[in-house]
Design a protein with these regions (language model features):
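Glycine-rich phosphate/diphosphate-binding loop of Rossmann-like nucleotide-binding domains
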Residues: 2-43
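C-terminal binding/interaction regions
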Residues: 5, 11-18, 22, 98-167
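Short glycine-rich or small-residue beta-strand-to-loop segments that form or flank ligand, phosphate
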Residues: 6-11, 35-37, 63-65, 86, ...
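Short glycine/serine/threonine-rich phosphate/pyrophosphate-binding segments
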Residues: 16-20, 44-48, 67-76, 95-98, ...
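Short, solvent-exposed amphipathic alpha-helical segments in soluble enzyme
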Residues: 23-29, 53, 80-82, 131-132
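N-terminal beta-loop-helix "entrance" segment that forms/cooperates
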Residues: 36-57
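Glycine-rich phosphate-binding loop
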Residues: 51-93
């Protein structure tokens, strides 16, 4: 991946890559640069801090952070940066991701984590949300978002037409 990136995707374990890759796919669709890596709030806190500290010099504008179970990674990142942090709860325990959802969303005032849905749909939405944030200062990304939303609407119209023809 590029040295200068728009978005840094962090995940607590490499087992989260199958979910978090959906965020990267969304970012790529909008022409954004990104990097994905593993950093654990519990097992490698020094690595987490180094990645946060290096981010401004790399051009990072948004963090997308996925973790399961206790899921403290997004909160730790949010506590140490003023950049937007989007949290993706991951289903990795007997609680089916609800523990990760609550750990990610329940942040104290002044330390926000924008939290999306559990799992791959949430990771996709994290990529789209990051693009929307970055688009505030980049008209070419805003234009790609308009096209993306139009494609979503066109799919709904096509589905409605197919159902209408079956009736």
């Amino acid at each position: 991946m590029a040295t200068t990136i728009d978005v840094l995707i962090l995940m607590g374990s490499d087992s989260d890559a199958a979910v978090m890759s959906a965020a990267g796919e969304a970012l790529t669709e909008f022409g954004l640069t990104w990097e994905m890596t593993v950093a654990s709030a519990h097992r490698s806190p020094a690595r987490v801090m180094r990645l946060i500290d290096e981010a401004p010099g790399r051009g990072v504008k948004v963090f997308i952070v996925g973790a399961g179970a206790a899921a403290h990674l997004a909160g730790v990142v949010a506590a140490h940066t003023t950049m937007p942090v989007i949290g993706v709860p991951i289903d990795s325990s007997a609680l089916k991701g609800m523990d990760a959802l609550l750990s990610t969303v329940q942040m104290p005032p002044g330390v926000p984590v924008a939290t999306v849905a559990i799992g791959k749909p949430g990771a996709t939405n994290a990529g789209v949300l990051a693009a929307q944030m970055i688009a505030l200062g980049r008209p070419e990304i805003a234009a790609k978002l308009v096209d993306y939303k139009k494609k979503l609407a066109d799919k709904v119209e096509a589905a409605a037409e197919r159902l209408k023809n079956k009736a």
